[in-house]
């Protein structure tokens, strides 16, 4: 299921970029999809890599994609979608949205504050308590920001079609937040593998729903 989720995530990134003219909204969503696909791929890698190899390559994907690419992509997507492109790429916004995940991922790569515990049918990625203080706000905080940002923007919309469209995107983002927290925040550390794998596919379904809703009549 993880391999299927990875393939679909990659395809969604390609699909969004291939429909109509490219813009930074599409690029940021594609970044999120590809990073999410690589993040999901860590489970599949555990099958073919040794523990020593996984501690290097698997953890690297977790840091770079799960703690950097995913939150940056999804936060930029919501910001660009709701505030427009021209006033988004300034020093203030980039420093708030991009720098914290990058710093967090850099800390992970340099200090590698994680331990990989192997169990019969999978793996559990356990972060040291001090690192969770960075990990949880960065990964899930940026997802909550994305859903909340779209929700706040909806209050000022008067066009029914646009409200419906933005509402669908908000619901998709909210679904990703809830599913991600259960599948990656709770199940991963508890060793609930079926929930983890089901969460991979459910997140991809929400990604597809957002892509479809965003691209509807926008090409």
How should each PLM-predicted stretch be described?
Residues 1-9, 22-108, 132-141, 192-207:
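Individual alpha-helical transmembrane segments in multi-pass integral membrane proteins
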Residues 10-14, 146-149, 208-217:
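Alpha-helical transmembrane segments
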Residues 15-42, 93-96, 129-186:
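Alpha-helical transmembrane segments of multi-pass integral membrane proteins
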Residues 15-16, 39, 80, 111, ...:
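Juxtamembrane cytosolic interface motif at the C-terminal end of transmembrane helices
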Residues 44-53, 109-120, 181-190:
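Juxtamembrane "helix-exit" motif on the non-cytosolic side of transmembrane helices
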Residues 78-87, 117, 148-164, 217-219:
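Cytoplasmic membrane-interface regions of multi-pass membrane proteins
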Residues 117-131:
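Juxtamembrane membrane-water interface segments that cap and precede transmembrane helices
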Residues 167-219:
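Interfacial "cap-and-anchor" motif at the non-cytosolic start of specific transmembrane alpha-helices
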């Amino acid at each position: 299921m993880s391999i299927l989720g990875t393939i679909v995530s990659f395809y969604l990134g390609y699909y969004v970029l291939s429909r109509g003219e490219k813009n930074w909204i599409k690029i940021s969503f594609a970044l999120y999809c590809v990073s999410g696909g690589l993040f999901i791929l860590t489970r599949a890698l555990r099958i073919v890599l040794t523990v020593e190899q996984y501690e290097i390559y698997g953890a690297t994907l977790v840091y770079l994609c799960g703690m950097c690419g995913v939150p940056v992509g999804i936060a930029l997507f919501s910001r660009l979608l709701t505030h427009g492109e021209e006033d988004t790429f300034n020093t203030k916004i980039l420093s708030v949205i991009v720098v914290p995940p990058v710093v967090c991922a850099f800390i992970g790569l340099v200090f590698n504050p994680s331990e990989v515990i192997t169990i019969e049918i999978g793996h559990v990625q356990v972060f040291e308590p001090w690192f969770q203080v960075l990990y949880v706000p960065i990964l899930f905080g940026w997802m909550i920001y994305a859903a909340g940002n779209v929700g706040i923007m909806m209050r000022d919309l008067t066009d029914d079609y646009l409200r419906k469209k933005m509402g669908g995107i908000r619901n998709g983002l909210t679904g990703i937040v809830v599913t991600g927290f259960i599948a990656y925040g709770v199940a991963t550390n508890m060793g609930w593998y079926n929930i983890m794998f089901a969460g991979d596919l459910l997140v991809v379904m929400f990604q597809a729903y957002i892509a479809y809703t965003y691209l509807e009549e926008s090409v």
